[in-house]
Amino acid sequence: MRTERIKTDVLIIGGGTAGCFAAYVIGQKSERKVLIAEKANIKRSGCLAAGVNALNAYITEGRVPQDYVDYAKKDAHGIVREDLLLSMSERLNHVTKVMEDLGLVILKDENGKYVARGNRNIKINGENMKPILAKAAAEQENVTVLNHVNITDYKTENGKITGAVGFGVNEDIFYDIDAEAVLCATGGAAGLYRPNNPGFSRHKMWYPPFNTGAGYAMGLLSGAEMTTFEMRFIALRCKDTIAPTGTIAQGVGARQVNAHGDIYETKYGLTTSQRVYGTVMENREGNGPCYLRTEGISKEQEQDLYKAYLNMAPSQTLKWMEAARVLRKKRRDRRYRAIYRRRTYSQRLLGRQ
């Protein structure tokens, strides 16, 4: 294994959404040399690799950043850092404008205003969100991208991070990187619990299975101060496809119902954890399977759902289309059987004459 030594001003570990956006901003605002180290390829890596159909953190008209802080605090049952939330919330709309200027399509109404989905979300066509960001970052003259490089440890000196080391995923290279500043953007930790699907499908999950929590481990091993580990976000997902449920619940107002048709969301609550807990309890008590009731939605709403999931979780749209195809085939087979029975009966009558 050969060693490659690199010196840079800023090292960004992880080339997902946060890493690419940080590289783009630094590239725009300074002449500092930036290096992105990404263990996949920045074009389609990170939690937004497949896209997203809404920006779920936006200060909509008539709202203020503190409103978002209050919502997040309530949803997490108080287990939050309000100061960090407020700092983030105050910049949400600015970042959204930057993304739109880069080419992200944000849906607008007849008056040219963003189409809101609830009090904190706006609808987008975001299947290509990650390629847009990757291109913007890579085009900066002072930004260099190292794809397929897995960073494993920080370099420290006198209690300060001075760089990092790692290795090539596809090539037999050891990387020794010195940097004046290091930004960790490796994402969260997926796969901590038993997967929904067995065997080769065990990686069918919402967040990237290769978000291993390595960035957290590197920080802990280096003696860094860590925060907000007290709260674990676990969202409700659609069976088989692991597609988000908020698109259905908020998009068409679908209610959570059990196998008896009872609306159970009011029984447990509507925070993220309560929606998951309620579904688990209903199944444990023998009231499952549980559904999001879409019966009665208009044809236009149905098409909107199809398009929305194509921007984020196409497997859900494909599952619906396949189910519709199977249903049409069953109906067609029933009609053919009915026609055959009628013809047979007519022939029998004719035979008796």
Indicate where each model-derived feature is located.
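Core beta-strand elements of the Rossmann-like FAD/NAD(P) dinucleotide-binding domain
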Residues: R5-T8, E171-A181
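N-terminal Rossmann-like FAD-binding beta1-loop-alpha1 element of flavoenzymes
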Residues: V10-I36
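Short, well-ordered coil/turn residues at beta-beta hairpins
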Residues: G14, A179-A181, A185-T186, A259
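Glycine-rich FAD pyrophosphate-binding loop
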Residues: Q28-A50
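Glycine-rich active-site loop/strand segments that organize a redox cofactor
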Residues: N56-M88
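Mobile, glycine/GP-rich and aromatic-enriched active-site lid/loop segments adjacent to catalytic centers
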Residues: N93, E100-T152, T228-Q353
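Helical element adjacent to the flavin cofactor pocket in flavoenzyme catalytic cores
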Residues: G126-T152, N158-D176, Y216, S222
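Glycine-rich loop(s) and the adjacent beta-strand/alpha-helix scaffold that form part
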Residues: C184-A243
